[in-house]
Swiss-Prot record:
Official protein name in the record: Small ribosomal subunit protein uS9
One example of a Gene Ontology biological process annotation: translation
Key words, A-Z: Ribonucleoprotein, Ribosomal protein
Gene name in the database record: rpsI
GO molecular function, one term: RNA binding
The keyword Ribonucleoprotein is annotated on this UniProt entry: yes
HAMAP family: Ribosomal_uS9_B (MF_00532_B)
The keyword Ribosomal protein appears for this protein: yes
Record-linked Pfam families: Ribosomal_S9
InterPro entries the record matches: Ribosomal_Su5_D2-typ_SF, Ribosomal_uS9, Ribosomal_uS9_bac/plastid, Ribosomal_uS9_CS, Ribsml_uS5_D2-typ_fold_subgr
Gene3D superfamilies in UniProt: 3.30.230.10
Family: Belongs to the universal ribosomal protein uS9 family.
Length: 130
């Protein structure tokens, strides 16, 4: 049982997280650093831990993550998605709880591209009547 590992890939915005769950005491490593050292915001740390807390597995697995691309918010969302998928592989009975909270759904929202003639995606240049 000690060598059993569960893998999950999570994506959010332009971030991709490859997550590995190993039986352990609840340590979370992100790109070789502790979760608290990687993310400076308590909200992001809470987001990452949500699937583990929801299923009651926060002290049952060690989580090893490699994440790349995007910013901190996208990376946190990708890690949460990856952890949820890995937990599902570990125990299929967790599916209803994870699905209800929306942790298994890939958030498809992406940054809208800038259009020519505009200053940003939708922001138009200032209009002058005269």
């Amino acid at each position: 049982m000690a060598n059993v590992q569960y893998y999950g890939t999570g994506r959010r915005k332009s971030s991709v997280a490859r997550v590995r769950l190993v039986a352990g005491e609840g340590n979370i490593l992100v790109n070789g650093r502790a979760l608290e050292n990687y993310f400076n915001y308590e909200t992001l740390i809470r987001d990452v831990k949500q699937p583990l807390v929801l299923t009651g597995n926060e002290n049952k697995y060690d989580v090893i993550v490699k994440v790349e691309g995007g910013g901190f918010t996208g990376q946190a969302g990708a890690i949460r998605h990856g952890i949820s998928r890995a937990l599902l592989k570990a125990d299929l009975d967790l599916r209803p709880a994870l699905k209800k909270e929306g942790f298994l759904t890939r958030d498809a929202r992406m940054k809208e591209r800038k259009k020519y003639g505009l200053k940003a995606a939708r922001r138009a240049p200032q209009f002058s009547k005269r």
